[in-house]
């Protein structure tokens, strides 16, 4: 049983109501029930790909009635492509111009192709393969251009952007090791933007750890100021 039947408006709405009223039912699932991390070989020090097992078939083949289905997707963890974030105007209320420049580095295409290829090998294992009706064969595309086209048309973000306010000691670093913005008093940045590069995994837990550390730094700073003020008092 999967969430595929509940992607429609009626069944999805009923499942949502059941969850809100009773805290039970299909909507208690967050959709991605399993995952895996792996590298190019067993000696890899860091994973290069992450797989997500999604308990729903979001885009079933046309003209096919599918009662249940699941999907497994691969994610490249260390892309080399770099995007930009620029001011759109001098108006502080104006939204910034964000260009992620996905797949602008050739090596990302190579990594994505290999990630899909290795994921198919995992799917072919006896414990899982018997449940899979259809999978993508990246080698069935006869040219590099066709493989690139297929990847570009289907690739999506998983919303782990980092690095726009990176920490460091060089002149291009935005914050120092105390999370303080260089050149501006009493301003810290505490989120994923301070990471110099994206990590090989999900960003939520590291950001929570950063926030806890930042709270300690701010509290320590307040205590120091309180002591200094106290010394000045008669």
Locations of the language-model features?
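C-terminal structured subdomain/cap of oxidoreductase catalytic cores
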Residues: 1-2, 41, 70-128, 148-234
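Mid-to-C-terminal "cap/lid" subdomains and adjacent gly/pro-rich loops that border
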Residues: 1-66, 121-126, 144, 153, ...
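An alpha-helix initiation/capping motif
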Residues: 137-149
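Short acidic alpha-helical/loop segments enriched in Asp/Glu that coordinate divalent cations
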Residues: 128-140
């Amino acid at each position: 049983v999967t969430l595929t039947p509940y992607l429609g408006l009626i069944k999805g709405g009923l499942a949502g109501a059941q969850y809100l009223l009773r805290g039970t039912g299909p909507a208690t699932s967050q959709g991605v029930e399993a995952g895996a991390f792996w590298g190019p070989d067993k000696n890899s020090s860091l994973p290069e790909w992450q797989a997500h097992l999604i308990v729903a078939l979001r885009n079933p083949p046309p003209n096919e009635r599918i009662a249940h289905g699941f999907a497994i997707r691969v994610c490249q963890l260390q892309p080399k492509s770099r995007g930009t974030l620029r001011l759109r105007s001098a108006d502080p209320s104006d939204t910034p111009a964000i260009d992620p420049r996905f797949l602008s580095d050739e090596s990302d295409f190579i990594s994505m192709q290999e990630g899909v290829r290795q994921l198919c090998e995992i799917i072919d294992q006896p414990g899982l393969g018997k449940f899979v009706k259809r999978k993508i064969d990246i080698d069935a595309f006869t040219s590099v251009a066709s493989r690139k086209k297929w990847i570009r048309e289907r690739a999506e973000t998983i919303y782990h952007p980092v690095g726009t306010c990176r920490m460091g000691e060089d002149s291009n670093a935005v914050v120092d090791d105390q999370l303080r913005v260089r050149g501006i008093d009493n301003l810290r940045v505490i989120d994923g933007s301070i990471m110099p590069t994206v990590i090989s995994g999900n960003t939520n837990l590291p950001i929570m750890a950063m926030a806890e550390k930042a709270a300690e730094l701010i509290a320590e700073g307040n205590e120091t100021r309180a002591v200094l003020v106290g010394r000045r008092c008669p």
